[in-house]
From Swiss-Prot:
GO cellular component: cytoplasm
Subunit structure: Homodimer.
Compartments it resides in: Cytoplasm
Classification via InterPro entries: aa-tRNA-synth_I_CS, Anticodon_Met, Met-tRNA-synth_bsu_C, Met-tRNA_synth, Met-tRNA_synth_2, Methionyl/Leucyl_tRNA_Synth, MetRS_core, NA-bd_OB-fold
Motif placement: 'HIGH' region: 12-22
Name of the encoding gene: metG
Cofactor note: Binds 1 zinc ion per subunit.
Binding-site list for ATP: 299
Record-given protein name: Methionine--tRNA ligase
The entry's keywords: Aminoacyl-tRNA synthetase, ATP-binding, Cytoplasm, Ligase, Metal-binding, Nucleotide-binding, Protein biosynthesis, RNA-binding, tRNA-binding, Zinc
Amino acid sequence: MKKTFYITTPIYYPSDKLHIGHSYTTVAADAMARFKRLTGYDVMFLTGTDEHGQKIQRIAREKGMSPKEYVDGIVEWIKDLWKTMDISYDHFIRTTDAYHEEIVQKIFMKLYEQGDIYKGEYEGWYCTPCESFWTESQLVDGKCPDCGRPVERVTEEGYFFRLSAYGDKLLKYYEEHPDFIQPESRRNEMINFIKAGLEDLFVSRSTFDWGIKVPFDPKHVIYVWIDALSNYITALGYMTENDEKFKKYWPADVHLVGKEIVRFHTIIWPAMLMALGLPLPKKVFGHGWLILEGGKMSKSKGNVVDPKELVDRYGVDAIRYFLLREVPFGADGVFSNEALINRINSDLANDLGNLLSRTVTMIEKYFDGVLPKPSSQEEIDEDLINVAQNLPQKVEEYMDKLQFSNALIEIWKLVSRANKYIDETMPWVLAKDESKRGRLGTVLYNLAESLRFIGILISPFMPNTPKKMFEQLGITEDLTTWESLKFGLLKEGTRVKRGEILFPRIDVEKELASLEKKTEEKTKETKEEKIDYITIEDFSKVQLRVAEILEAEKVEGSDKLIKMKLKVGEEIRQIVGGIGKYYSPEELIGKKIIIVYNLQPRKLMGIESQGMLLAATNEGKMALLTVDKDIESGSKIS
């Protein structure tokens, strides 16, 4: 019976199309899944989409669509992207799948019935893009510590998960399982986070309805992280009659995630599993970001690289190779067109492509395209053979540590050694001496056999290139398995045939100029597209008024909020504004400012705010909008 291996990616949030950073995670998971299949494992590879939440509901409403209609379109694009990227997932889960929703409700009910979930009132800060709740002390400059975007103050009745009860258990688990969180730096971050004190987690929302209903209280929907994290077990049939896959594959061997969501996967998710009495995943690996000059790629910032465009231009294997080779998997890396092109030219065109081309060309030229029989091996041959024979074990060791870059570096040592072997043995010189024909045959056989090893070992990283290599070398399927990685199995008499160049060289200067021009055009188009025009009728719905600040005081418990009493004509209003880091209460009194007069009141830290003041912000600065002449409070602005 085969050993099992269960690997997952995060399920991606389909608020917009995905970028190369998402492909990075998924290509890495795919390479690992393919490698484990190659080495004889029964693999389960899961990916999918996390489709609920307030942000999706807002975007869909803006586009005049239902949330389900909106995500359906994005999901089709994502599935097409994974097809383009040669992703060999075994199951694609959507959190809108009926079976997932049903199991999530069962999980919520179980946790509620055993006392791990209870009803209460939440008051704090909420980041809509991240779907995350934060305390005042966790904010960085008053913004979300994960994404750096503004947060909203919310007061809401709902359900809480007793996360605080699991802090000591989590720390003990980390101590007993030192490899659970990788790399080591992420582990230390999580230990420090827990030691600072865990607060109970708000796990339902009632201010929007795009989500899975709390089964016994349907005006609440289940908080997106409880919903999303459960996918790793709902996809296997947990809590159903058909739970064979769950029994077979759980616990997961590795959750691959971006470093920004390690906290959810190593604190919230394990605590949930402990509460459910289930074993924890064996490893959570939080990889770094692919960064463009100027910062992390982000759909909301618009500074993303479209993987489909890259594949159209350079081919899928070149992109997969670059992603896995360029940056050590746990670290951040910078994506640039120049680095990509140089990597293609150097490693793929010059090293691998030339090795195949030279080998096949020489076999055709000197042996009419028929692989010769090797004769006795000399010391220089044994050196090449040893590099090849020792390679599978080294690659396996690196892959088990998720060190994709190091695994590829090892494979390229054989590529380099084989190229050097050509220069050392000089087949073109041997061909001139008939008495050296046997020696020439040995050299060319060793090169072809080295290429067979290379093709097998790069297949998890670059699924298409080995097929082209094997076709040119005449290698049959039985000699492309892990078990066939024994030097000397390639059959003499095999017919080779030159094919297309694996990776044509790219003119770096011309290509960069072309890409720069294309980027400029795209940026111009994007800027034009991003103006979200409204009609005069839309604007006329907003009532702006001049208001005079009569009183101002800090809101207790917040360094950001100021409560102000305003005179708006004959009316006195109260507004709460997040301007405490830029203005003292004293300097506000007497100012005439602009407010949104007809905004629906809402509570901030339990204090009702009857409108919203207007301010300009830029690069950490803020300035209130005021009037340049003395005018009566209550005056309308049009």
